[in-house]
Amino acid sequence: IGQCNLLEAKVVETGSERMKIEIDGVGIAETLPAAGVQAGTRGTLALRPEKIKISASLPADVADEVHFRGKVHDCLYLGDVTIYIVELENGLLVEAMLPNSASGQAKFFDDNDAVEIAWRFDAGHFLAE
């Protein structure tokens, strides 16, 4: 079925179209609301690597996106894609997948390169404990 980042989090605020969660040791993110959860509910944000953008710098003012900084911990070239393991500022490892066809390069970043990752608020799913 594929790979998935599992980020432990707590619901901070709920709403009809979005909810705010605090990803442990990382920060606040918005996601789709989950049925039956309320502020204080613990759970996991499931986020697929192909839903995560990675760049040396991303515009911070893009509506509906969540942004975090980190550095490239490792990468794995898989032909048409490269999987980057990004170490966030708190040490959490997150996998991001980047198509190699975007620029014809096999590798965009080297180990220890500073990067930003981002995903749309509706890219992940919050799974309550």
What are these regions (language model features)?
Residues 4-6, 10-129:
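Non-catalytic connector elements of ABC transporters
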